[in-house]
Amino acid sequence: MYKNYIFDLYGTLIDIRTDEWSEEPWEEFAAWLTGNGMPYTGSEVKALYDNEVNRLTSVKTKYTSPEIDIIPVFEVICKKHRPDITDEEVWKAGEQFRIITTKMIKLYPNTKKVLTGLKKAGKKVYLLSNAQRVFTWQELVKTGIVDDFDDIFISS
């Protein structure tokens, strides 16, 4: 039997559905930003978000599909209206965006049982993901599996 087990998160341990395409989540995110001193309409914040994502993904790299760190995108969005915003507040904006755009999140059947069983058997359990840390961490906590890993490696 193996001593170490490495898992991806989304599509392996967690089933999630997000909506970053329809108008409603952008309007809700804009309302949250406006309430925090960063006035936007939904279409304005979506356009800025899309522009920054496109700018960052267009940077030449040796990889065919590079995974960007999304925090700089939220930094641009936030600093446009609040130049002195803290890193913690930018992080909170990223978390709030994910909360708003998440339509469903749940563990796949037996996920907790498998992770707990491996730990009880003395095995090392690791998470290796190319996801966004700002999104992933709160979802690990929310689903109750954050403490089931010996270590967590997230690319962003």
Outline where the language-model segments fall:
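Active-site neighborhood of HAD-like aspartate-dependent phosphohydrolases
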Residues: 1-47
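Pocket-edge positions in alpha/beta enzyme catalytic cores
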Residues: 18-21, 37, 62, 66, ...
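Short, glycine/charged-enriched secondary-structure capping and boundary segments
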Residues: 19-22, 140-144
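A metal-dependent, Asp-based hydrolase signature
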Residues: 30, 42-96
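Substrate-recognition element of Asp-dependent hydrolases with the DxDx(T/V) motif
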Residues: 90-107, 111-141, 152-155
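Conserved H-loop
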Residues: 146-150
